[in-house]
Amino acid sequence: MAARIRKGDRVVVIAGASKGREGEVLRVLPAENKAVVSGVAVAKRHTKARGMGEQGGIIQKEMPVHLSNIALIDPETKKPTRVGFRVLEDGRKVRVARKSDSVIDG
């Protein structure tokens, strides 16, 4: 199945503890239906020192967010939108913003 959310997309969180925050998709986990978004769902992890060069301590790590809790930001209107697909005349399948009907990529 084609991905509606891809790496590099600007998204907004529409549900959950981070509701309203915007960020860029760093990684998509299709097997889990989740995505890692910059600045969203940040958790603190306690790590041990590994070897001589690496330091232990508390690090902040972005955790995955379920795809149903994020919405793509329409590049034209700068508002959250759903994503559809359309096949162009030259045969390419592209993503389309449902609100503005504009092509997102391609």
Swiss-Prot record:
SUPFAM superfamilies: Translation proteins SH3-like domain (SSF50104)
A GO biological process held by the record: translation
Record flagged with keyword rRNA processing: no
PROSITE patterns: RIBOSOMAL_L24 (PS01108)
Chain's role: One of two assembly initiator proteins, it binds directly to the 5'-end of the 23S rRNA, where it nucleates assembly of the 50S subunit.
Bilayer-spanning residue ranges: none
SMART domains reported for this sequence: KOW
Protein name in UniProt: Large ribosomal subunit protein uL24
Subunit: Part of the 50S ribosomal subunit.
Record HAMAP family: Ribosomal_uL24_B
Superkingdom as given in the UniProt entry: Bacteria
Signal peptide: none
InterPro entries, sorted: KOW, Rib_uL2_dom2, Ribosomal_uL24, Ribosomal_uL24_CS, Ribosomal_uL24_KOW, Translation_prot_SH3-like_sf
GO CC, any one term: ribonucleoprotein complex
